[in-house]
Design a protein with these regions (language model features):
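C-terminal functional modules
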Residues: 1-25, 30
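Conserved beta-strand/loop scaffold segments within soluble protein domains that form the structured core
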Residues: 23-28, 33-285, 289-292, 302-307
Length: 307
C-alpha cells in the first residue's frame, strides 16, 4: 500500500504522481510493491537468494519508458539490491530509477543498489537516477549506488544522477566500458549540507575505435559537509574523452576534486578541467538589487548552477 509519504517520495525521485505508463517495478521497504511488464520489456525477480530484478528489453524497442524507483519509509531497513539490464540491439529507451528514504526513527536506513547494464549494438539509453532523503528522526539515511555499463558497438548511454538533499552518507561508484563507436555521457549533480559525506568515483574506459566519453560533475557543499570526487577517463584507442568538474563551496565545507585522464594510445584525445570556488559577490549583489534577500539570491544561484 502506497501512503502519502510514499507518494511524495515517488514524485520527488521519479516524477510519478500515479501509476507509471509502461513497464515498472516499485520497490518499498525491502520488497516489491508493484510490478508490470510490457510486450517489449520484461521485468522478473532475481533467482532465489538474490534481491533485485532482471530487465530484458527486446531488439528494436523504441519510445518506451521503464520506471524502477525504490522507497524506504521504515526506519532500520537496510538492503543490497542487484538490478541487471539486458538491452537488445537497435533500441531507444528511457529508464527512470531513483531512491527516496524517509527516516523518522533512530536506526539507520540504507539502500545499496548495484546496477549492471549490457547495452546492445546501436542502442541508445537515457538513464536518470535521483536520490533524496527526509525525516526528523536521529537515524541516518545512507545510499551507496554502484553502476556498471557495457556498451556494444555504436551504442550510447546518457546517465544523469542527482542527489537532491537529505542523504547523510553516500559512496557512488560508476564504470562504463565503451566499444567501437560507442558514447557515454555522465552528468552528476550533487548537494550536501550539515555534516553529510559524499564520495563519487566515476570511470569511463574507451576501448573501441572512435569511442567517446564525457563526465560533467556539478556540486554544492554547504555547512560542514564533505565531498570527494574522482572522475577518470581512460583512452585505449583512437577516442575522445572530456572530464569537467565544477563545485561551489560554502560555510565550513570541504571539497576534494581529483580528475584523471590516462592515454594508452597515441590517437587518444583526452581533456580534464576542475574548478572549486564560492558564489561571486557581484552575482549576489545583482540579484539583491532586484529585491531578493541574500538567502533568496543564494538559493536562486544554486538552483541555476545545479539545473
Amino acid at each position: 500500500m502506497i501512503t502519502e509519504i510514499d507518494a511524495s517520495l515517488l514524485e520527488k525521485i521519479a516524477d510519478l504522481t500515479g501509476k507509471p505508463v509502461g513497464a515498472f517495478n516499485i520497490r518499498k521497504d525491502g520488497g516489491c510493491e508493484a510490478r508490470q511488464s510490457t510486450e517489449h520489456i520484461a521485468i522478473d525477480p532475481q533467482p532465489e537468494g538474490k534481491s533485485g530484478i532482471i530487465i530484458r528489453i527486446k531488439d528494436g524497442t523504441k519510445g518506451e519508458q521503464c520506471h524502477i524507483p525504490v522507497i524506504i519509509s521504515k526506519s532500520g531497513v537496510t538492503e543490497i539490491v542487484y538490478n541487471d539490464f539486458y538491452v537488445g540491439e537497435n533500441c531507444d529507451i528511457d529508464i527512470v530509477a531513483g531512491c527516496g528514504i524517509h527516516n523518522s526513527g533512530c536506526n539507520e536506513s540504507r539502500h545499496d543498489g548495484i546496477h549492471t547494464f549490457y547495452i546492445g549494438k546501436n542502442s541508445h539509453v537515457r538513464y536518470s537516477e535521483k536520490h533524496y532523503g527526509e525525516g526528523d528522526g536521529e537515524g541516518s539515511r545512507v545510499m551507496n549506488p554502484t553502476t556498471i555499463v557495457y556498451l556494444d558497438e555504436g551504442a550510447s548511454i546518457q546517465m544523469e544522477t542527482v542527489q537532491i538533499r537529505g542523504i547523510d552518507s553516500t559512496v557512488r561508484k560508476t564504470k562504463i566500458v565503451c566499444g567501437k563507436g560507442a558514447e557515454a555521457v555522465i552528468t552528476e549533480r550533487l548537494l550536501t549540507h550539515g555534516k553529510q559525506h559524499a564520495e563519487s568515483d566515476m570511470e569511463i574506459e574507451l576501448n573501441g575505435e572512435d569511442a567517446r566519453g564525457r563526465v560533467i560533475s556539478r556540486s554544492v557543499a554547504q555547512d560542514e559537509s564533505k565531498q570527494i570526487f574522482h572522475p577518470v577517463v581512460v583512452g585505449n584507442s583512437k577516442c575522445f574523452g572530456h572530464v569537467q568538474c565544477d563545485s561551489i563551496i560554502m560555510g565550513k565545507a570541504t571539497i576534494e576534486s581529483i580528475p584523471a585522464i590516462t592515454a594508452n594510445s597515441t590517437d587518444a584525445q583526452l581533456i580534464h578541467e576542475a574548478a572549486i570556488g564560492k558564489i561571486a559577490g557581484d552575482q549576489l549583489l545583482k540579484l539583491q538589487t532586484l529585491g531578493l534577500t541574500e538567502e533568496e539570491a543564494e538559493d536562486t544561484i544554486l538552483k541555476g548552477f545545479l539545473a
